[in-house]
């Protein structure tokens, strides 16, 4: 949903944001009242945009697996939301945006024509996008980087990371550098931060012993051999960058890292 925030600046109209969880209260009727107030404000300030974050908090399906108990506060709130959206005509100057990571549980009535007409899937950023996001957070924090830091390389190591993950990665790298009293954040700090995000924190007090270490070493070596063979046989496939048999807080006894 962070992808929607730039809309506030680009649209140059009032941007009214809220979280759907704010509508749900102990007292029945409060949620519906807040929805009415929200839409009344948007109409008064039209042209305007309403942004409802985590809309699944009040808009779960009323049928089947995700059924809402009848007369529940959430159902009244959802009904009011549907009523307000039906009240818009084609010339309405109010646009409603909703964000959720659980589109599968939303009530079908929410997706009917005249309500939420369009669905936009926001995927995790690609390598170019990740590099741009890293640049933003490094610049925003005025982070002093070492000469060996190449954000394009860091972006290649972070496949599948969201914008929030990348922001946390920059913070983690800065913390790791700070703990060692460094005056700049070096590439190794980013690498360790990536490893922590992917595999967890090293358990330095829980090292593998004897046959267990041998089994894990063979297992990870097998991953590395296959990964290396694939990278040589198929053009464009990444090579194995690192192996580890240090236990991690994520219950992994080791890992083989291959960036995309």
Swiss-Prot record:
Obligatory cofactor(s): Zn(2+)
Q: Which GO terms describe its biological process?
A: proteolysis
**What keywords are assigned to this protein?**
ATP-binding, Chloroplast, Hydrolase, Membrane, Metal-binding, Metalloprotease, Nucleotide-binding, Plastid, Protease, Thylakoid, Zinc
Q: How does it sit in the membrane?
A: Single-pass membrane protein
One GO cellular-component annotation of the UniProt record comes to:
chloroplast thylakoid membrane
Where along the chain is Zn(2+) bound? 219, 223
Query: Which enzyme class, named as a word?
Result: hydrolase
> What does the record give as EC number?
3.4.24.-
Reading the lineage from the top rank, the first entry is: Eukaryota
UniProt cofactor note: Binds 1 zinc ion per subunit.
- Where is it located? Plastid, Chloroplast thylakoid membrane
MF (Gene Ontology): ATP binding; ATP hydrolysis activity; ATP-dependent peptidase activity; metal ion binding; metalloendopeptidase activity
The free-text function statement in the UniProt record for this protein reads: Probable ATP-dependent zinc metallopeptidase.
Q: Which family does the similarity line name?
A: In the N-terminal section; belongs to the AAA ATPase family. In the C-terminal section; belongs to the peptidase M41 family.
Report the protein name in the record.
ATP-dependent zinc metalloprotease FTSH, chloroplastic
Q: Which organism is it from?
A: Helianthus annuus
The protein's gene is named FTSH
